[in-house]
């Protein structure tokens, strides 16, 4: 089994204001146990900003982008050194892999990243992945490591994504304020009702909350990878989950795995939205057809030709994602028009489809 494990800042600190070394030892021991049982593990970790904050003597936190990037630059090396020194105790070589959203958006970089990670796994190296915060401005940020872990699970075609956090899983209500709240052991699909249970932001030490974890679960399960959100302080959590023990909340995968190219389309961050009429929704969802300009009612950009866009039904629900053949400004001019009018309106044509069916992932 190939497993992607995501560790958030709240897990790495064990409730303190600094990286908790004993917790890291426990977590890496668990990874070593799972690897010894014949499984492959890819680790997605937070903690670089916190490690930098710790290294600089806990200065007041302004939370500006410049400060976060400074702290990440100071802390990333220290975080990796800590991981490497502990992993050495268990005979695990490690590799640092820093990614940005552009590495998932660009097909060549996406394939290069996958080749690197496959090489690590083939040679028994533990890849340790973080977002490259020192260079990732807002436009090229994945945004949080929960989402990053889902993209990585997609990238390596993982059999399971495990997100360890400071919560036991997804509850029917906030257990901190509602004593009747109960843990939800299995979620078949991330519905609007499930989203309503997500609550607000995460801890003051990290950037993620249950909302971002649900987003990660939705991305991964759509691509065919099941997800488990479980407590990071549970003893031997990773090994227990891999063995199939019920721990936390398990999100079931949607059908079979997507082919590699469609995994890439789903992994790319959608930069725009196309609102469709009912006829176009039926053509895409029920008949597996392409999206024609005639079926588009509204275009929300900006985006360029070849970018991933979300296709939405009139009620706002997402029907599919796909690669657009036209940039936003051009689609706005031909939306609602017959395909035969494209060249007359634009002065050129890239074909009759706004999004070809071969470039669509139906959801």
Curated annotation (Swiss-Prot):
Traced from the root, the source organism's taxonomic lineage reads: Bacteria, Thermotogati, Deinococcota, Deinococci, Deinococcales
The cross-references to InterPro entries, in alphabetical order and at most eight, read: AceGlu_kinase-like_sf, Asp/Glu/Uridylate_kinase, G5K_ProB, Glu/AcGlu_kinase, Glu_5kinase, Glu_5kinase/COase_Synthase, Glutamate_5-kinase_CS, PUA
Protein name, as recorded: Glutamate 5-kinase
Q: Locate the PUA domain: which residues?
A: 271-349
For this UniProt record, the keywords arranged alphabetically read as follows: Amino-acid biosynthesis, ATP-binding, Cytoplasm, Kinase, Nucleotide-binding, Proline biosynthesis, Transferase
What PROSITE patterns does the record point to?
Answer: GLUTAMATE_5_KINASE, PUA
UniProt cross-references to SMART domains, sorted A to Z: PUA (SM00359)
What EC number(s) does its UniProt record assign? 2.7.2.11
List, in alphabetical order, the Gene Ontology terms for molecular function in this entry.
Answer: ATP binding; glutamate 5-kinase activity; RNA binding
Q: Where in the cell is it found?
A: Cytoplasm
Query: Per the UniProt entry, what are the Gene Ontology biological process annotations, in alphabetical order?
Result: L-proline biosynthetic process
Concerning its family, UniProt says: Belongs to the glutamate 5-kinase family.
Binding of substrate occurs at 46, 133, 145
Q: Which GO terms describe its cellular component?
A: cytosol
Primary residence: cytoplasm
Q: Which reaction does it catalyse?
A: L-glutamate + ATP = L-glutamyl 5-phosphate + ADP
Its biological purpose is as follows: Catalyzes the transfer of a phosphate group to glutamate to form L-glutamate 5-phosphate.
Give the residues the record marks as binding ATP. Answer: 6, 165-166, 207-213
């Amino acid at each position: 089994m190939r497993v992607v494990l995501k560790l958030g800042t709240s897990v790495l600190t064990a409730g303190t204001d600094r990286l908790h070394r004993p917790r890291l030892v426990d977590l890496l021991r668990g990874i070593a146990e799972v690897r010894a049982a014949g499984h492959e593990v890819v680790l997605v970790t937070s903690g670089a900003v916190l490690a930098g904050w710790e290294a600089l003597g806990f200065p007041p936190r302004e939370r500006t982008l410049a400060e976060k990037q400074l702290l990440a630059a100071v802390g990333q090396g220290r975080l990796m050194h800590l991981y490497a020194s502990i992993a050495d105790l268990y005979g695990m070589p490690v590799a640092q892999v820093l990614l940005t959203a552009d590495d998932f958006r660009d097909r060549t970089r996406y394939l290069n990243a996958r080749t690197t990670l496959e090489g690590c796994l083939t040679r028994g190296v533990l890849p340790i992945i973080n977002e490259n915060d020192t260079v990732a401005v807002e436009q090229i940020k994945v945004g949080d490591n929960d989402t990053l872990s889902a993209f990585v699970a997609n990238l390596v075609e993982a059999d399971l994504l495990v997100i360890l956090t400071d919560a036991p899983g997804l509850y029917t209500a906030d257990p901190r304020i509602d004593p009747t709240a109960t843990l939800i052991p299995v979620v078949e699909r991330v519905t609007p009702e499930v989203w309503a249970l997500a609550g607000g932001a995460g801890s003051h030490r990290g950037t993620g909350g249950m909302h971002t974890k649900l987003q990660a679960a939705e991305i991964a399960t759509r691509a065919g990878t099941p997800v488990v959100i479980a407590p990071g302080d549970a003893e031997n959590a990773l090994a227990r989950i891999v063995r199939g023990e019920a721990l936390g909340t398990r999100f079931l995968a949607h059908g079979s795995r997507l082919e590699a190219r469609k995994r890439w389309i789903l992994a790319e961050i959608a930069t725009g939205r196309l609102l469709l009429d009912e006829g176009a929704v039926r053509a895409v969802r029920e008949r597996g057809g392409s999206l024609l300009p005639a079926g588009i009612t509204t275009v929300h950009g900006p985006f360029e030709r070849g970018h991933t866009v979300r296709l939405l039904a009139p009620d706002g629900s997402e029907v599919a994602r796909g690669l657009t053949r036209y940039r936003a400004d051009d689609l706005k001019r031909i939306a609602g028009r017959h395909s035969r009018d494209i060249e007359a309106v634009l002065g050129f044509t890239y074909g009759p489809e706004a999004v070809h069916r071969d470039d669509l992932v139906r959801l």
